[in-house]
């Protein structure tokens, strides 16, 4: 057999395998996000979140999420996932939020038809890709301390203590 037809079959099978793999995937990957993140931001520390209101599932939410920056007064990406007891999605809501809306993450059973509602928050650019499905996923993930206080008083006390120690050694 000549190498030409065999190579053509190999390429055709490879293309078919890629098409089948793409057709089966109904979720976004981190690789997809690379195309959503431009190199400039409208303000220092600007970030984006997937945003949608009551989408049917995670795919529909992430697929149609507007590609815009979060308002300056927000800092976190919020996700609320309502699902059946079987785990099938009923609705997905994602948005940019301030700290106050992230203080009650976790899962709870809804009194409405036995549904489960899981809520999560995260800090970072487009960090709300996955859905919270259980207590392990329904967390508040932050990359910086929530209680950020001005560190100068502590630094000053350390500096003064070091100066006193140094002066004591010099005398």
UniProtKB/Swiss-Prot annotation:
One term of GO molecular function: acetylcholine receptor inhibitor activity
General function of this protein: Acts as a modulator of nicotinic acetylcholine receptors (nAChRs) function in the brain. Inhibits nicotine-induced Ca(2+) influx through nAChRs. In vitro, specifically inhibits alpha-3:beta-4 and alpha-7 nAChR currents in an allosteric manner. Acts as a positive regulator of Wnt/beta-catenin signaling.
Domain UPAR/Ly6, chain residue ranges per copy: 47-141
GO BP annotations, alphabetical order: positive regulation of canonical Wnt signaling pathway
Pro-peptide positions on chain: 148-171
SUBUNIT field: Interacts with nicotinic acetylcholine receptors (nAChRs) including CHRNA3, CHRNA4, CHRNA5, CHRNA6, CHRNA7, CHRNB2 and CHRNB4. Interacts (via NxI motif) with LRP6.
The gene coding this protein: LYPD6
Tissue expression as described in the entry: Detected in the temporal cortex (at protein level). Ubiquitous. Highly expressed in brain and heart.
Membrane topology: Lipid-anchor; GPI-anchor
Domain text: The UPAR/Ly6 domain is sufficient for inhibiting alpha-3:beta-4 and alpha-7-dependent nAChR currents.
Residues with a covalently attached lipid (GPI-anchor amidated asparagine): 147
UniProt xrefs under Gene3D superfamilies: CD59
Domain of life: Eukaryota
Signal peptide limits: 1-22
Xref: InterPro entries: LYPD6-like, Snake_toxin-like_sf
Alphabetized PANTHER family for the sequence: LY6/PLAUR DOMAIN-CONTAINING PROTEIN 6, LY6_PLAUR DOMAIN-CONTAINING PROTEIN 6
Keywords: Cell membrane, Cell projection, Cytoplasm, Disulfide bond, Glycoprotein, GPI-anchor, Lipoprotein, Membrane, Secreted, Signal, Synapse, Synaptosome
UniProt-recorded name of the protein: Ly6/PLAUR domain-containing protein 6
């Amino acid at each position: 057999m000549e190498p030409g037809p065999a190579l053509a079959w190999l390429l055709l099978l490879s293309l078919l395998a890629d098409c089948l793999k793409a057709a089966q995937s109904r979720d976004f990957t981190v690789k997809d996000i690379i195309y959503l993140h431009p190199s400039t931001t409208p303000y220092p520390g600007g970030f984006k979140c997937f945003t949608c209101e009551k989408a049917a599932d995670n795919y529909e939410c992430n697929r149609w999420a507007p590609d815009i920056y979060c308002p300056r007064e927000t800092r976190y990406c919020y996700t609320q996932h309502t699902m059946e007891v079987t785990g099938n999605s009923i609705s997905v809501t994602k948005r940019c939020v301030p700290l106050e809306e992230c203080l009650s993450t976790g899962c709870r059973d809804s009194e409405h038809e036995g549904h489960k509602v899981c809520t999560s928050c995260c800090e970072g650019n487009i960090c709300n890709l996955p859905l919270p499905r259980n207590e392990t996923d329904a967390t508040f993930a932050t990359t910086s301390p929530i209680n950020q206080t001005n560190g100068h008083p502590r630094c000053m006390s350390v500096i003064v203590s070091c100066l006193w120690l140094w002066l004591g050694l010099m005398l």
